[in-house]
Design a protein with these regions (language model features):
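Active-site donor-nucleotide binding/catalytic segment of nucleotide-sugar enzymes
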Residues: 195-250, 345
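A donor-sugar binding/catalytic signature common to diverse glycosyltransferases
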Residues: 114-125, 266-312
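C-terminal amphipathic helix plus adjacent low-complexity
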Residues: 167-174, 308-401
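Donor nucleotide-activated moiety binding/catalytic core segment of transferases
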Residues: 92-104, 225, 240-293
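Active-site and donor-binding regions of nucleotide-sugar-utilizing enzymes
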Residues: 2-8, 52-159
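Active-site-proximal region of nucleotide-activated glycan assembly enzymes
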Residues: 114, 127-192, 321-331
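N-terminal subdomain of nucleotide-sugar transferases
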Residues: 1-44
């Protein structure tokens, strides 16, 4: 997770407390020699960070966690690193928790902890000092195809998230989502390209989306499904023509099989989805993209968007609207100190919606206000809410002229 550290150090200018292992602080030249994507120009440009110069960050407090704190757990896992990772993601590891407590007790002014993984050991250590833990990750909709989104969750990421709980809380708070929206309109708001409108007659009954074998989604939040179990499930549960899309980051290649065709990422993901009447996934974000294209999805694992996958169309629109505009966060805000502090006040869902929609509108500053009106989804209260934000934005622009 080098990018996570580099992004935080680039975006957050004030002093940080870094709890890490020694290898994260090695010179970037080492990672360049090993060809890691995080130190390439493309990686930096895509995620908006610079390679850090640790020597000029003297005000950062760095706490090195000894990896020996995980050695007993690794032994218990039979030296299986994947099993250890699952344990790391789902259980409290006593020695590791104590190592984190030792690091936290050296710093008495921590506002929150930013992490990229579910980590019960970290949660337990932070709870001892009443420090909020915020789980951040790349969101399911990403640039350049979509507006870049991220996950910002006080409960978990990938699995064990607060998405569904927050949706029902928003309803109780009186947030009125516009049921007259079409799912295609929601997608149109987030998609950057308008060149995918050509209709393609689906030729496959089921599209099967595979995932990286040792990713946290599979190891910890798959309801015990892996790629092989997914293929077995598809064979036993679905008749008709099938196509399988392996993940480009997979370490394995599928053998040819009479039961399905293979798309080795020759198609764009959008063209792949267009060719399918239904999508089967464990918990890939491709499932969300399919839902936004009105393609039926079967989700077998745990994921943040699964609660949106309901049969009632009006209810699905409401849930997707909340998920896209309130639960998901504009990526540029993930490491924004002002935004993080805003969320630490536990604002209402109306306030979160307002912050996100206003960001999306203002980020399209090259557009005229009239153009923005035509490209804005009427999310809340049949559009009255957004029209108020547009008026606010227009007045702000006039003041700055």
């Amino acid at each position: 997770y080098l990018w996570f550290l580099y992004k935080a150090m680039t975006a957050i200018k004030e002093p940080l407390a870094l709890i890490t292992t020694q290898d994260y602080l090695l010179p970037c030249t080492k990672w360049q020699e090993e060809g890691r994507w995080e130190v390439t120009d493309d990686g930096q440009k895509r995620l908006g960070y610079e390679l850090p110069n640790f020597s000029v960050r003297q005000k950062d407090n760095v706490y090195i966690v000894n990896e020996e704190s995980l050695s007993e757990a690794l032994t218990e896992c039979g030296d299986n690193s994947n099993l250890l990772f699952k344990k790391f993601l789902t259980e409290i590891i006593p020695d590791f928790k104590n190592a984190l407590i030792a690091a936290l007790q050296k710093q008495n002014d921590i506002e929150c902890i930013l992490t990229i993984c579910n980590c019960p050991s970290l949660n337990a250590a932070a709870e001892k000092y009443n420090i909020p833990v915020i789980n951040l990750e790349l969101g399911p909709l990403r640039s350049p195809t979509y507006l870049f989104t991220g996950y910002f969750d006080f409960s978990g990421v990938n699995g064990n998230t607060e998405a569904e709980k927050r949706y029902f809380a928003a309803k109780q708070q009186g947030v009125v989502f516009n049921k007259k929206n079409r799912i295609s309109a929601l997608r149109d708001f987030f998609i950057n390209s308008r060149n995918d409108d050509d209709y393609i007659e689906p030729e496959y009954d089921v599209g099967i989306v595979l995932q990286v074998e040792n990713d946290s989604n599979i190891l910890a939040f798959s309801n015990s499904f892996d790629n092989q179990a997914l293929l077995d499930y598809a064979e036993g549960s679905f008749i008709g023509k099938k196509i399988v899309r392996p993940h480009p980051g997979s370490h394995f290649r599928l053998n040819e099989n009479l039961g399905y065709e293979i798309d080795n990422n020759n198609l764009s993901i959008i063209d792949f989805l267009k060719k399918c009447r239904k999508i089967l996934t464990i918990n890939s974000s491709v499932g969300l993209e399919a839902m936004l294209m009105n393609i039926p999805v079967k989700i077998l694992g745990d994921c943040s968007y699964a609660f949106c996958n309901v049969d009632d169309v009006d209810e699905r629109v409401e849930r997707l609207t909340f998920y896209l505009f309130s639960y998901l966060v504009p990526f540029d805000l993930l490491f924004n100190a002002e935004y993080i502090r805003f969320r630490l006040t536990f604002p209402s869902e109306h306030e979160i919606l307002s912050k996100h929609i206003l960001y999306y509108l203002s980020s399209r500053e090259k557009q005229s206000i009239i153009d923005m009106k035509t490209s804005t989804t009427d999310v809340v209260e049949n559009g009255m809410y957004e029209r108020g934000l547009l008026k606010e934005l227009e007045e702000l622009k006039i003041k700055n002229i």
